[in-house]
Amino acid sequence: MKALLRRLLLVCFVLGALVAGACASGPAVVDHAFGFDARVDSPGIEILNFRYGASGMPGTSGDVGIRQFGRSPQVTGINGPMPLGDTLYVTWRIKATGQEFEDTVNLKSRLPSDMANQRIHFSVKESQLFVYVIDPVPRPADWPVVGPRKFQYEKVRQIYPDAPGTPPNHSRNHSAS
């Protein structure tokens, strides 16, 4: 009887380890932040939708706001342990012209290897999406001021586009009529 109980416990342990290993094969869970504030950082722009990664966590996509209120939120911020996103998808409209744009950024090769306590933040200027990684440490005097004004005292790296002067991205050529 004891041998049977031991075998049963061993089988349960092995199955539990296999299930735990299968669950761990998804994206790394890292304590970091994601957000944007179109009202302040992107005047004249309406965010139509966005999606950071594929976790579906609240604040990582505009889907819930669109379903509940008929439009995407214009500001969001989420902090804490969450899956590290592989991509950032954003669609937006220039309010003055009605022209719509979309862009998908592959974040895998752009993010630093250690994203703990870092913030991913995006803004839009006309037809160009900008993505930043904000390190919450004070910006050294010799570090350039980059990105949204509210982060001017922190170390900010622009990770997209690669360099100034990158051509505009993926116009959907829609206009308000």
Per-region residue spans from a language model:
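Bacterial N-terminal signal peptides
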Residues: 11-20
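Compositionally biased low-complexity segments at domain edges in trafficked proteins
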Residues: 114-177
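Tryptophan-paired
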Residues: 48-97
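Post-signal peptide N-terminal segment of mature Sec-exported envelope proteins
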Residues: 30-46
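Bacterial N-terminal signal peptides that target proteins for export
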Residues: 1-12
